[in-house]
Amino acid sequence: MSSIKKLGTSSLAVLLVAETALACAGEGELEPEREGVPDASAEVADAGDAGDGADAADAADADPCSASGLCIVPVPIDTRVNVTSVSGSGAKDVWAVGTARTTLHYDGAVWEKADTIPYDAAPFTMRAVWVGGPNDVWVADGPTIHHSTGWKGPSATVWESSVLAGTYTAPTAISGNDGRVIIGRQISNQFDDYEAAIVTCSGWDAGGLLEPTYLENRHFRTNGTDGLWSIAMTGPNEAWGTSFPTTNGPGARVVRAHLASPGDGGEPDAGPSWQVEEYDSRTERNLYGVWGDEQAVWLVGEGGVIRRMTPANLPSGVFENVPSPVIADLRGIFGFGADDVWAVGDDATVLHWDGKVWSRLASPFDSAADKPRLFSVWGSAPNDVWIGGNGVILHFEGKAP
């Protein structure tokens, strides 16, 4: 079994809407989407992202910056837009996506909102963005993957689009490493017709995935909604993902996909092949985010759950329970090394791991009556960390505790 390798991306928060086919409201009818336990059909539009407005950020009731160095930054969006995912290639190339098909870009000075990606479909929520480089941008949008060769401005940025194979499926998380891209999908199994929850490819080419492989689906065979909530690569040949809740249980399943040689689980005489194995998360709570490096793979989720897998524990297949300082749901995680990992979640929760203990950072919303949910965290460096949430983007430029 291969060792845990360095991860090249953050986990990506995935937040889906109700299973009934909802009619899409106009883009002016913005309400924060209810981002709780997923119960979804892959082909459901935003429906105006209707939900509980209490979770939206109220900057008027918040401080510009907290004592910890977290600051609210100006972003050209309605405060009811949920920023669901953040990724970038560097300090001057940061992307964020969210509800109402919102796409944002930061060039090192200001955030700009892109024109809506031209696509003949209802305005789905942008579930995930992954940036492999300045000229390699991937976005999950309902049942569709969009790809751009880089930011050229709000109106001039060029996109190509592709719908992946399968019926009632939707990409929910994207990750990549060293030329390899892996996509986690929500699937809807009908009458024992099982779709692939994991798709891997060698990049983007001529309007679609280059050399796509749809991985065997042994672990995702619940009739109805199943598949992956988050996914993160730990090397070009390895990724970890967390599952959706199903009628059979909560979203507490964890799988590892890796390219195995014939002597390590692959088919004899067939050369290396992708294998998918399930691991014990030691929780029955929903798991919303995953991140890892050569030292550990981290999981975060419902009720402040934090789990860790180290190379020493990999043969056992069992994750370690790590004490959490909060009971709020944690929805995103990203890190830079063994002593510098970030996690974010409900009630404006921002946590940091210093190699020994998780601690909560002061937030600009600590004194606010309504505290936003935070969904995604990504950084170009330890002193350049971005966080997206309910109507807000936070930036950290200091030194974490």
Where in the sequence are the language-model features?
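Residue-level hotspots at or immediately adjacent to binding/recognition sites across diverse folds
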Residues: G26-E29, G36, E43-A45, D52-P401
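Bacterial N-terminal signal peptides that target proteins for export
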Residues: M1-V14
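Generic hydrophobic alpha-helical membrane-segment signal
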Residues: L7, P38-A40
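C-terminal motif of bacterial Sec signal peptides marking the signal peptidase cleavage site
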Residues: T20-A23
